[in-house]
Amino acid sequence: LTFTAPRRDDDAFASYKNRNKAALQNMEMNPQVAFSDSVSAGIYMHHPRRARIKADMIDKMDYDKILSMYQDRYKDASDFTFIFVGNVNVEEMKPLIAEYLGSLPAINRKETFKDNKVDMRQGVYKNEFVRKQETAKASNFVLLNGDCKYDLKNDILLSMTSQILDLVYTAKVREDEGGTYGVYVGGQLSKYPKEKALLQIVFETAPAKREKLMQIIFAELDNIAKAGPSEGDLNKVKEFMLKKHAEDLKENSYWLGSIDEYLFTGMNPIKDYEQIVTASP
């Protein structure tokens, strides 16, 4: 029925609009929203496809157009890929799949992704601004990005780098300096529309400590780039990754995500995982 007979409910849609409009209006009073907006605008240079939805946009929602778009997207199941994982009897499942999926509409439409040119800013960009808050704090966001081949080795190395920096910043920023409750470090490798890697570092601190902590953040980035990680930190991360991978292999959700990854990007996130982790310098 999701494909063939989506149910129109004008009352539910009106309720959805009212709830979201009220929530978005309340968000505007949160200083953190201004920070998030500034981060997005700085990275994506005010690209309209990265604009945050605001309360006034809710009134412009066209239910008829939404349903029309939905029906267009789901009128052709031929270009869909359905993935089933779990402890099932394959032979018993096949006729059920044939019955239910075989009855879905199909017009043999072939599609691919479109590059909407939502590119990240290149070069050095810095934006500082002040907003009045009940409790003074400095929110900090650092983003590094660049071209990077999309493969399992680079994905693992980026994950290792993120985790090692997390250990370093926990020791030097949180424990030694007492400057923050924690530093978030996250890395991401993407294939579409361009092969890119990004590393983001986020933390909050007292305004008086911001400058010193930022110096530590960049000094440790420079140190790991030039000298590499300590043997102790590297071994901790390797041990954790191997243990978690062994646990993940028992989960249906992990296999589902891995199959989806392979179909979408061609990268097999399971094959050679352990060998790459143990071999990484």
Language-model regions, residue ranges each:
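Peptidyl-prolyl cis-trans isomerase
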Residues: R7-R8, A12-F13, M61
